[in-house]
Amino acid sequence: MLAVGPAMDGELPPHEAPPAGSVLYSPPPLQTPLCGPSVQDTMLHYPWWNSFSPTTYPAFSSESHQFMNSSFIMGQPCTDPSYGPAATAPSFPPKSSDFPQDSSYLDDLSNASIFSSSVDSLSDIADTPDFPPADSLSQVPTIWDVSTGPSAHDKLFPPSGTFTGLEDPVSSLSSTPLLISYQAQSQPEEDDEAEEDEAEELGHAETYADYVPSKSKIGRQHPDRVVETSTLSSVPPPDITYTLALPSSDSGALSALQLEAITYACQQHEVLLPSGQRAGFLIGDGAGVGKGRTVAGVILENYLRGRKKALWFSVSNDLKYDAERDLRDIAAPGIAVHALSKIKYGDNTTSEGVLFATYSALIGESQAGGQHRTRIRQILEWCGEAFDGVIVFDECHKAKNASSTKMGKAVLDLQNKLPLARVVYASATGASEPRNMIYMSRLGIWGEGTPFRTFEEFLHAIEKRGVGAMEIVAMDMKVSGMYIARQLSFSGVTFRIEEIPLTPAFERIYNRAALLWAEALGVFQQAADWIGLESRKSLWGQFWSAHQRFFKYLCVAAKVHRLVELAQEELAQDKCVVIGLQSTGEARTREVLGEKEGQLDGFVSAAEGVFLSLIQKHFPSTKRRRERGAGSKRKRRPRGRGAKAPRLVYEAAGVIRISDDSSTESDGGLDSDFHSSPESLLDDDVVIVDAIGLPADDRGPLCPPQRDLHGPGVLERVERLKQDLLAKVQALGRELPVNTLDELIDQLGGPECVAEMTGRKGRVVSRPDGTVAFESRAEQGLSIDHVNLREKERFMSGEKLVAIISEASSSGVSLQADRRVQNQRRRVHMTLELPWSADRAIQQFGRTHRSNQVSAPEYIFLISELAGERRFASIVAKRLESLGALTHGDRRATESRDLSKYNFENKYGARALSCVLTTILSQTESKVPLPQGYPGGDAAFFRDMKQGLLSVGIGGRESRSGCLDVEKDCSISKFLNRILGLEVHKQNALFQYFSDTFDHLIAADKREGKYDMGILDLAPGIDEIYEESQQVFLAPGHPQDGQVVFYKISVDRGLKWEEAYARSLELTGTHDGFYLSYKVRGNKPSCLLAQQNRGKLFTVYKPNIGRQSQLESLDSLSRRFRRVTAEEAREPWESSYTFSLTHCSHTTWNRHCRLVQEGKDCAQGLRLRHHYMLCGALLRVWGRIAAVMADVTSSSYLQIVRLKTKDKKKQVGIKIPEVCVRRVLQELQLMDADVKRKQARTRGLLAPPSTPRPLALPFGPGEVLDLTYSPPAQAFPAPSPFTFPALGPGPGGQLLGAPDTPDAPADPVALLHQGCEINFKEVLEDMLRSLNAAPPAEPPGPLGPLGAGAAGAPAGGAPERQSVIQFSPPFPNS
């Protein structure tokens, strides 16, 4: 293994001049000798060494090839300052004051948890701008499996017999930031004072790093600042081997960013996957970066290469004009764009150009002329069998759920039938969940020749680990050359959540509506019982869908008044307003128009329309049953048989459908679902609930006797129930709010002042005489399709200063403050309805934040204080979190920290829900206190919550124990949807209890070290981070093996006096400043610097640990410390700073430490901390490392961390707890030995040569056998230093940690991996003789790579030697 000398040791501070002969500058001793002293002496003084100049360690520059293909292996010495002495530069920038710098997770090795972190240290931490620009990627070690040859891109995850993939169980916890309230706790004055110093040195630093192409040097700079997630920027892209045919131009039509994406896409298209299909490329650039021009550039590049046909799929036919514009902008006017929708079926006369089509066109069919024709067959015929042109899937997230939709299957089918096509996926959102990646079959992540045989295997492995694993996949995709993801910087963009209180009048209306819906549930059940309705799945599906939509309209209506106020405030400040909506309510407006023959007496209430439509169309009746029976293909069961009574009892409850709790595309969805087959609803989706809040078994039979089903009074009674309910809804409707969109336009000045870009064809407007009327949105000379484009022009020109956009119009519309338009006011983007999915959210947010803008927009999210409405924010937070990982490689990329506190749809949410329902319905004891101040106390809370849950269909049958069973499948989305139907005070109390339980569970997992926050930053805000050593191990793979690198990292967290004094000069608080402790320990008082926060708590800085994570109260400070001047504090501060580099706190106070006296390590209060990281091809070793972790710590959870060293190198990898280091290294050595053994077999070394001779020059990883592995001094804990297992009395050492072999193996290659006596002198003599006489069969290569090189010239003068000796088996004298 390659071992790099320490850049930093625990003996001296890195920024002080070391005395001569210090440990820092001396070669590290061999921890475990591989041969006896006499042999070492002979070997190290052999004159052969003098004939070669010493070489240094490789620089790992991103411009170089992969490490194993670098100049180091090729025999060329390479000088690298990166691993030289770390103490030569005394200049250190001051640390950020906003980050915790303490760590204790390496202290207690007996703790079973991997990462015992305090609550404080994992809270949200402010972003810092201290990451370098992305062009500093030249300093990033290329530790991934990247090669410049084409074969390097054949597969993303090469398979191996020994690679277990991600199939081992690893606890996957979704990342949900905990809401933290700091509370000062009085600390014991004795030994416990040390404990407050220590906290986990992990946290979230910045999310983005500035992006500049690191290896592509062509093109002009992009006009706007572009960023990449810090996680993705931590790994380099592959070297460029493809040369563009595009003509060079200085026009800037294609920026450097876009040319880089074109280059990598075309380079990836040169690769064939193991399945024989051509590899595809994913452009994950964010909205506004210019994906359209990039795609046009790929098409033009292939056109110039002779591939004259291309397919371009998008979401709307209108975007054909954008495609033509993009091709025109990059000077490709000769490429024609043909709209498939304008071409007749069977017409393939167009010979070349771009065939533009929508995804829905893929499933188009025609029966004209008696022939069955399909669009996909027409496309295939146009392309031809050997088609190798470009297929662009633009906005490819629209093809999500490919396995379950006809459209998605067509997308997959097209890719399979054109295996040589050059596929480009382009989307700002990619897919919002891993399961939506199924259509990206050309990425080569799953399938033949990969670790995952099917997409389902990949999905299971990734979802089991949550978003963190997806971040690793994104990095691996980038480094493999199949993915690129940049987006416009969000600097200058402000996010704000406006939580709106409800007025008493609105709350009264809401409570009346909730009670009426509870009554309606009972009425629907009673009517269904009376008429003997058999299958009720469709009925209850419609009921709960309408229930959800009704309360959604109410939630939105509660915010209209506040939104109008905010909009007018912003307009008064010379800004313009963009308002985002998800639905328009047009369907209900048209229904009312039909009922009243086109005459309206006021604005229409969409909420009332939903309720009335449900009753009129779906109320149980015999007429409805007859219609259903006639229209259904299913057999109708005979009704009224006694055997069916239990079925009726069972189905008398409300039914929850999975699809009911997700977005409905339009208001018409309520009607369109009625005739869908109810077989799609499984029986386990049923929730048993009693109509009047009583246990079902107490009500007697739910259906009347059989004779009553046909009695003369039954139908009349059912009809009377319906009419009574209709009357009550109409009475309520007179108080319900009107259509949100119409009211907004009216209050903001009418259609003359508001540019409406929605999908509706008409609207209700106020007339000057006070009446209202319905009018078409179409204008003279314009079709309805072009009205939105005209409205956009009016907004961009400044004619109108308010724009309202809906989901239907949000794709592809640019509304930013463009430099090229007249209206350059700052955009304020307000969201009335948080979109149902991240797909829609990103599309809407990207409308106002794009390239070439004068100013960045402001985003305002309006959320009412209704607890149930947080359901909508919950969806967005979850979707955006996942989206960040999938599209940009970092889950925090698109996650607003304000929104994250509403994210409940994860593992903790499910556990919290189970606890809440069990506690309320089954009256079990809970550790979480109930909400305080509920009217009537705890007893009333349980009674009201139980009744409320039953009234919204959540509950179960009464069991024999007398307690209600918790519904097994009640998910978070169902729960949050249903509690919308509770009175306001009830839903708020219930939601508060749920939130408290949620927080309690997260806090418990944080205490146990099981909480996953995704990729965390190691020691954020600390600059003194160094690589002390690294060891390279081979990892199995196909077609080539990868490698992982084991790093030892040193972190100096101390705060120098100069920095502390400079910080103190900026303090202004009455109690801010330096403090000395009353208690003197070790003849010296403790010293600290206190800075008051906004509240009454103080942030504390100490000389040995920097910023302390535990906040202190003034009372706590005053009790133990006295305030002093800077002059008084200087000497104790400097003394503590120097002493704590090598001595723990116990030694400082007591002059000795019990652990040290026992020969153990004690890191309490030390400035210097050591961490261990495993970087590289992590997916290939994930299962192995997780198994080791589980064995040592009882938890297989792997924490991914990233860091930036003092010399600006960035690393991302698995953090290895110190207690696991020994076992992990042993596992890696065994894996490395297995790979080398496999490589030896493939090279045909099974037949030994007749005479010993050197091996040929190694050209790949694994052909180097390191016989003199020299780990750095004190690389591992002193109590049990890692050593290679001893072999016995002889001087030989066991290589690579392979197990002892009692008998000599028959396989000569195995000799490489068993212990044996080696006469190094004879080995060297044989190798030197062979230099002059090469065997005829195979000429020897030069011996340049024999020296791994020194890490620099130590102070002692002699270079540290690393020898890599190569020979063929059998060993001499073995």
UniProtKB/Swiss-Prot annotation:
Record flagged with keyword Transcription regulation: yes
Biological source species: Bos taurus
Lineage: superkingdom: Eukaryota
Gene transcribed to yield this protein: SBNO2
Start and end residues of each stretch annotated as Disordered: 1-25, 182-207, 620-644, 1280-1303, 1332-1374
The protein's name: Protein strawberry notch homolog 2
GO biological process, one term: cellular response to leukemia inhibitory factor
Ranges of biased composition (kind: Acidic residues): 188-200
Annotated Low complexity bias: 1351-1360
The protein's role, per its UniProt record: Seems to have transcriptional repression activity in macrophages. Acts as a transcriptional coregulator, that can have both coactivator and corepressor functions. Inhibits the DCSTAMP-repressive activity of TAL1, hence enhancing the access of the transcription factor MITF to the DC-STAMP promoter in osteoclast. Plays a role in bone homeostasis; required as a positive regulator in TNFSF11//RANKL-mediated osteoclast fusion via a DCSTAMP-dependent pathway. May also be required in the regulation of osteoblast differentiation. Involved in the transcriptional corepression of NF-kappaB in macrophages. Plays a role as a regulator in the pro-inflammatory cascade.
This protein's record includes keyword Cell membrane: no
Molecular-function GO term, any one: chromatin DNA binding
UniProt entry keywords in alphabetical sequence: Activator, Differentiation, Osteogenesis, Repressor, Transcription, Transcription regulation
